[in-house]
Amino acid sequence: RHGIRLTGLSHHAASIQGGRAAAAPAAASGATAVIAYNDLVALGLEAGLLELGKRCPADISIVGIDDIDLAGAVTPALTTVRMPIERSGALAVDLLLQAMNGTAIDDVVTLGSQLIVRASTAAPSAS
């Protein structure tokens, strides 16, 4: 759909080391962009791809999830999805207490997110 081909990579740890381990399979896949499980994986992926001679974002765009402080401090700064972690934790506790008190709770709770565009993403090259 929309000319996008999705390729899943095998499971790697949700850490910088896991991201480094995912670099070779990501490079071999021919992907022009990767959305990582979290920012730590994305940062490890960025480092691992650089070691393989791949430039971010010229060769491959990388997006993380969480918007940890380090995401904006690296070069290139990491594009990421900011999640309302504190709000979701507080909401989870509220829902648990409601359920324990026998109060009916919504089956689905939607929390917003925000894409923070930084320097790790760009349009794919024409080649």
Regions found by a protein language model. Give the residues of each.
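Bacterial carbohydrate/catabolite-sensing allosteric modules
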Residues: 1-127
